[in-house]
Curated annotation (Swiss-Prot):
Family that this chain belongs to: Belongs to the sodium:galactoside symporter (TC 2.A.2) family.
GO MF: symporter activity
Role this protein plays: Could be involved in sulfoquinovose import.
Classification via SUPFAM superfamilies: MFS general substrate transporter
Main location: membrane
Membrane topology qualifier: Multi-pass membrane protein
GO cellular component terms, semicolon-separated: plasma membrane
BP GO terms, sorted: carbohydrate transport; sodium ion transport; transmembrane transport
Gene symbol of the encoding locus: yihO
PANTHER family (UniProt xref): MAJOR FACILITATOR SUPERFAMILY DOMAIN-CONTAINING PROTEIN, SULFOQUINOVOSE IMPORTER-RELATED
Compartments where found: Cell inner membrane
Protein's name in the database: Putative sulfoquinovose importer
Pfam families: MFS_2
Stretches of the chain forming a coiled coil according to its record: none
Amino acid sequence: MSNHDPLTLKLSLREKCAYGVGDFGSNLMLCIGTLYLLKFYTDELGMPAYYGGIIFLVAKFFTAFTDMLTGVLLDSRRNIGAKGKFRPFILYASFPVALVATAQFFATHFTLPVKTAFATVLFMLFGLFYSLMNCSYGAMVPAITKNPHERAQLAAWRQGGATIGLLLCTVGFMPIQALFTRSPSLGYLIAAVIFSVCGLFSMWWCFSGVKERYIETVPDTHKPSILKSFCAIFRNPPLLVLCVANLCTLAAFNIKLAIQVYYTQYVLNDIHLLSWMGFFSMGCILIGVLLVPAAVKRFGKKQVYLGGLILWAVGDILNFIWGGTSFLFVIFSCIAFFGTAFVNSLNWALVPDTVDYGEWKTGIRAEGSVYTGYTFSRKISAALAGFLPGIMLTQIGYIPNIAQSDTTLLGLRQLIFLWPCGLAIIAALTMGFFYKLNEQRFAFIIEEIAQRKKTGNQIVATNNKQSISTVNN
């Protein structure tokens, strides 16, 4: 335990940067699959689009439960060594993540059923190792700092790293692949190798640069389990609301990313626009991320979150109505992606607060269970986001590498704009009406937890009617 006041302890710039580099590396390995794996399946492996959707659905549901298992593993740890409670998983799981991320782009010449089975197994393996690495990375924040402003800073650095990783994937992957005109499938593989190796070294940088200061083990009387991780969502109202909102926002964001490569190629007839659009829109996200700490300090997390959702919805509506040219598409996309910067950053800043809420309410601090309960909702969202584009591409009549019909073009416009817009509006209504954990209540919770530890009082807060009345009124 640090001798500094946990609520005022400041982190070094070097440590914040190292933490941000972690999600940079994580996204380099994740986003090559999010952005291009469906297109690789359809165009190089010859799979029907709905096959890809089913693969994503099955594998993401599987990894939703591996996230839960990771939480159980983290909370079950008792003999914690010098590397800490979470950091060893970042170090050791990152190598198989990079290896499988690359292997997913290996073009086989088997029959379609064998190709499908092979792709499904690889995607599930990627999800398993990614759960071990990324859940540990995210659950580590409460162990790094208890200062809410520093948590917002870490969330901003994390989202900044993720944005730069996504930007590089958007701008750099297809140009590398396009260099191999005689063997497009080899181009996919080489690009995947480059991004995965960079991601691996970034995760190792993160491991070496961050410090766990507040390592607490779960009491022996509390036996972690998948059921308890799942129940942690429903026993923690702020976490439940955040999970529902995140279910909408992550699905919206991933649908947009999955469809944009089809939209630029077939609606705007300019596949090279994808790199420019990625450069400008991800640049807007990066600017938004840099503004998050100041905006949160002035307006509070909830208000900034809602403002980001409104910008997102407005940008998508404008794009659906007037985004028929490349220039307007980029402009309106920048508005929408600028809004997503605040939303995606604060998703991560709000989760550690719910960890403290859970400790205040139950007397048990279980970062792993809370965080993986949250990531369970994210994986369900990602499963739907991976499933829907593949199914919808089939429903609207998409056929690879030919001119698309007017019905198909309209379907692409609806998929990339109206679906994300609708989901953003649902998320805004959910957070606006049901999320109650503001800055004042959070400060009260932290103070009461500290007082309990000082006095050795282990009374569970749910039995303290006076405390509950103070927070809820």
